[in-house]
Amino acid sequence: MTTPQIPPEESLIEYPCDFPIKVMGPHTEVYIEEIVALVVTHAPGFDAAQALVRRPSSTGKYIGLTFTVRAHSREQLDNIYRAVTGHPHTKYVL
């Protein structure tokens, strides 16, 4: 599947920019490590120590992860979204 091309003058996002991606899944270290690895694959400069916020659910069963990545193109963002959405344990991606 290809990403439709949007002319730069029609895009609402100016690249490069810092872009937050929110992911929700099970509250396990394995899941978090796997999602971080997927993000790093498409955003090699991503530093989880400084650009990852973790928010556990009230029951502790799930965790919300906010990754702030330095996005250089729509294609890069689409690739990150596809990767984290494709993880079998991911519940939501915003």
Which functions belong to the PLM regions below?
Residues 1-64, 68-94:
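Long, contiguous binding/interaction regions
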